[in-house]
From Swiss-Prot:
Entry keyword set: Ribonucleoprotein, Ribosomal protein
Protein name: Large ribosomal subunit protein uL29
UniProt xrefs under SUPFAM superfamilies: Ribosomal protein L29 (L29p)
NCBIfam families given in the database record: L29
Phylogenetic lineage: Bacteria, Pseudomonadati, Pseudomonadota, Gammaproteobacteria, Enterobacterales
Superkingdom classification of source: Bacteria
A Gene Ontology cellular-component term: cytosolic large ribosomal subunit
Family membership: Belongs to the universal ribosomal protein uL29 family.
Length: 64
């Protein structure tokens, strides 16, 4: 997800996006544990997306 897209979203939308990514991360972990995961690079991508969104949330809360 691009930073420009994320900056346009409200705090509530960003929180929903984090929840969606956390669920996806959990599902990836379950697939990896069952040896069904082929794309291991998704862990890194999702983890970084979550960090990006959390950083934006912190910025938005400090500004408002």
């Amino acid at each position: 997800m691009e930073l420009k897209e994320l900056r346009k979203k409200s705090i509530e939308e960003l929180e929903r996006e984090i929840l969606k990514l956390l669920r996806e991360q959990f599902n990836l972990r379950m697939h990896a544990a069952a040896s069904q995961l082929k794309e291991t690079d998704l862990f890194k991508k999702i983890r970084r997306d979550i960090a990006r969104i959390k950083t934006l949330l912190t910025e938005k809360v400090r500004v408002s």
